[in-house]
Amino acid sequence: MAKKVSKFFRIGVEGDTCDGRVISAQDIQEMAETFDPRVYGCRINLEHLRGILPDGIFKRYGDVAELKAEKIDDDSALKGKWALFAKITPTDDLIAMNKAAQKVYTSMEIQPNFANTGKCYLVGLAVTDDPASLGTEYLEFCRTAKHNPLNRFKLSPENLISVATPVELEFEDLPETVFTALTEKVKSIFGRKQASDDARLNDVHEAVTAVAEHVQEKLSATEQRLAEMETAFSALKQEVTDRADETSQAFTRLKNSLDHTESLTQQRRSKATGGGGDALMTNC
């Protein structure tokens, strides 16, 4: 099954957080500028809860792939505010929840001084069902509470958690590569439940055969493409050579023609001054 990637959707807007602090337009822009999954990957969790079991309800539900910052330009009350937009690569469970109209809001976890850079970074993205749990009513409680109840959900106490934002997720297939296609094929083979060692050995043999056939198929296709490129290059080389010869011959003909053509700017010899010039003398 091909992996999915979402289109860009809004995950947060400048404004209040759940502890009374404010996310500024600069914070939004910094998160878009600094985000790099190779430096720190931002994973998607449920209700800002990070479970440790891969099969538990609070497992991870995908990753943030890209971020961008844009000003909102619509007829809503948010017009003119800076917003953060994300592309995500979801798990099948998140896609299923979204199709069932569950967990349709997002809430950001922001680290203000990420890695001592002095800039904000998106370190977590939660999906939630009820905006009130991270919205106005909950916001007021967190402002006045002696101990912020959200602190236990944060990676660091100084991190900010944004008010939840409703989202509409649209997914598209990621292009399938040779590696992903082969991986899925082998995984499907080893995913079968077998009772005996002979059956497992057969699975290993089938997997090795599948790998060999897949590699051979891709090598043959690559060789064919290389042969086509070589043929095209040879034809192009011959065409360039022919044109160069034609140009050289044309230049030689032009040079020879010019060498045998009298120059109109060349100085002429003056007429002879002896005798009477053009007069004819008669001896009488």
Swiss-Prot record:
The keyword Hydrolase applies. GO terms for biological process: proteolysis; viral procapsid maturation. One of its GO terms (molecular function) is serine-type peptidase activity. It is an enzyme of class 3 (hydrolase). Its EC number is 3.4.21.-. Gene3D superfamilies: 3.90.20.10. The keyword Ribonucleoprotein does not apply. InterPro entries: Capsid_scaffold_GpO. Autocleaves itself into an N-terminal fragment containing the protease activity, that remains in the capsid following maturation. Keywords: Coiled coil, Hydrolase, Protease, Serine protease, Viral capsid assembly, Viral capsid maturation, Viral release from host cell. Residues 206-243 form a coiled coil. Residues 258-284 are annotated as: Disordered. The active site is at 19, 48, 107. Belongs to the P2likevirus scaffolding protein family. Scaffolding protein and protease involved in the icosahedric procapsid assembly. Coassembles with the capsid proteins to form the procapsid, in which the scaffolding protein is found within the external shell of icosahedrally arranged capsid protein subunits. In a subsequent step the scaffolding protein molecules are cleaved by the viral protease activity. This is Capsid assembly scaffolding protein. It comes from Escherichia phage P2 (Bacteriophage P2).
